[in-house]
Amino acid sequence: MLSLQFITHQTENYSYLESARMALEGGCKWIQLRMKEASPEEVEAVALQLKPLCKAKEAILILDDHVELAKKLEVDGVHLGKKDMPIGEARQMLGEAFIIGGTANTFEDVKLHHAAGADYLGIGPFRFTTTKKNLSPVLGLEGYTSILAQMNEAGIRIPVVAIGGIVAEDIPAIMETGVNGIALSGAILQAPDPVEETKRILNI
């Protein structure tokens, strides 16, 4: 089964919580609660409702950026973007038990995050995406192939999740580059039935 990380997104039809609930219902086992414009209090309110839902489905829950909150709420970990707290600092604060993921766009990013102790890397974007502002250069299939080859050559063994503007039809070709999983948001939420779409994607 595909290793799928669902990244929450608020749309006209769905709240952050509802988007995560549908992904869980469809069988997704890894949720990243991402609420970029929200205050820590707003994130905490949603996380407190989402945590038991994830637990009931035996799914991993990580927060985007909010390291202190992740520690306070005892979720499974955090995902840190390029402008968030440095991974090394987060590791000191959280200890070894928490999952820490980092965003990477180049092999240089990969080396830095690996050295800092990241548990996995979200590498992207695959293509242009409307869910993220200040987008890094688009990688495409060639970008993943190149970065993974350099990782292999350098002996860097760390799980890679492809992220950024990915739709279901892209998944087979992206997985062939050697990545370990896929992160999705819009591809699921824009489907007529997000629960069924999650199930379908997990079986690609």
UniProtKB/Swiss-Prot annotation:
Binds 1 Mg(2+) ion per subunit. Its EC number is 2.5.1.3. Mg(2+) binds at residues 65, 84. Keywords: Magnesium, Metal-binding, Thiamine biosynthesis, Transferase. 4-amino-2-methyl-5-(diphosphooxymethyl)pyrimidine binds at residues 32-36, 64, 103, 132. 2-[(2R,5Z)-2-carboxy-4-methylthiazol-5(2H)-ylidene]ethyl phosphate binds at residues 129-131, 165. GO terms for cellular component: cytoplasm. Pathway: Cofactor biosynthesis; thiamine diphosphate biosynthesis; thiamine phosphate from 4-amino-2-methyl-5-diphosphomethylpyrimidine and 4-methyl-5-(2-phosphoethyl)-thiazole: step 1/1. It is an enzyme of class 2 (transferase). InterPro entries: Aldolase_TIM, ThiamineP_synth_sf, ThiamineP_synth_TenI, TMP_synthase. One of its GO terms (biological process) is thiamine diphosphate biosynthetic process. It holds the Pfam family TMP-TENI. It catalyses: 2-[(2R,5Z)-2-carboxy-4-methylthiazol-5(2H)-ylidene]ethyl phosphate + 4-amino-2-methyl-5-(diphosphooxymethyl)pyrimidine + 2 H(+) = thiamine phosphate + CO2 + diphosphate; 2-(2-carboxy-4-methylthiazol-5-yl)ethyl phosphate + 4-amino-2-methyl-5-(diphosphooxymethyl)pyrimidine + 2 H(+) = thiamine phosphate + CO2 + diphosphate; 4-methyl-5-(2-phosphooxyethyl)-thiazole + 4-amino-2-methyl-5-(diphosphooxymethyl)pyrimidine + H(+) = thiamine phosphate + diphosphate. One of its GO terms (molecular function) is magnesium ion binding. Its cofactor is Mg(2+). NCBIfam families: PRK00043.2-3 (NF000736), thiE (TIGR00693). Condenses 4-methyl-5-(beta-hydroxyethyl)thiazole monophosphate (THZ-P) and 2-methyl-4-amino-5-hydroxymethyl pyrimidine pyrophosphate (HMP-PP) to form thiamine monophosphate (TMP). Belongs to the thiamine-phosphate synthase family. PANTHER family: THIAMINE-PHOSPHATE PYROPHOSPHORYLASE (PTHR20857), THIAMINE-PHOSPHATE SYNTHASE (PTHR20857:SF15). This is Thiamine-phosphate synthase. It comes from Bacteroides fragilis (strain ATCC 25285 / DSM 2151 / CCUG 4856 / JCM 11019 / LMG 10263 / NCTC 9343 / Onslow / VPI 2553 / EN-2). The gene is thiE.
